[in-house]
Amino acid sequence: MSDNTRRRRTVARHGQLRSPGAVSQLLRLLAISMAVVLVSGIGVAAYFYLDFSNTVSANAVDLDGQEDLPPDIGAYKGGFNLVLTGVDTCEDDYKQYFGDRCTGGDAEGTLNDVNLLVHVSEEPRRITVVSFPRDLMIPIPSCEDEDGNATAAMSKQPLNVAYTDGGLNCVVRTISSLTDQEVQFAASVTFGGVIEITNAIGGVDVCLANPIRDRYTGLDMSAGTHTVKGLEALQFLRTRHGVGDGSDLGRIGNQQQYMSSLARKLISGEVLGNVPVMLKLANTGIQNLETSTSLADPMMIVQIALAVKSVPFEDIVFVQYPTL
């Protein structure tokens, strides 16, 4: 890790994104959307499994001498935890849009700027998503970096250095130690990953009361309803100079509208009722998510799917970890 990266641990300087708070808000919303993607994606797995199982069972034929059959796959027993992190990294397809952040000495650094602990309870199933501030000063345990070298434990460092020191596993170890919760599953996503998922479902609809013309992001949109994806989606999420009084409040309003629209579309019949779209979404998720080995097991995915398939969207609650 470079000295520059260490110096910027608590500040993500994203080009024209001049406020670190705005970047943190953006990444948090992106990670929250990915929590929805994971839950919805698991729902997709449940849909395929149950549809396949019901179809095969309806046409099955009993054979003599086969009383002892393998047990059915059941839902994951008990509650479980999943860590989801949004990482701030300079991806080749998007780095040209982030100015100094991705052209200077900080370009090689990767920080876990968004950190979520997703808890799925025992029956009755409920989902609680706890958000941890990136600059939360806490102990960081000793971890192994990508070269297999052990990093020294630190008594008080911002949470967002954990990924740099030891990747996804170090983030999990840090959050597990902080909360005294065992974590069974984990995944990370980049900014570009969320954009690719938006593309996979054909974009999301946003409605503008007034036109937006922002020379900083290059966004030029008329008033009314638009379906945004790709670069335009990225511009829409970043713009603030062309919205309202140019403050971060306008940007946050855009982001909330975008993420709400994304979440609604993910759980709508337009996605969950469309097999080709679901397959494309699943494939895009595989390509854009870094997961723990426990999430690489198809049977485990089915078990998780069966555990959460009936949780209504209103029973997914988001809270922030308290800071002193």
Region locations from a protein language model:
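Non-catalytic, solvent-exposed segments at the cell envelope interface
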Residues: 2-324
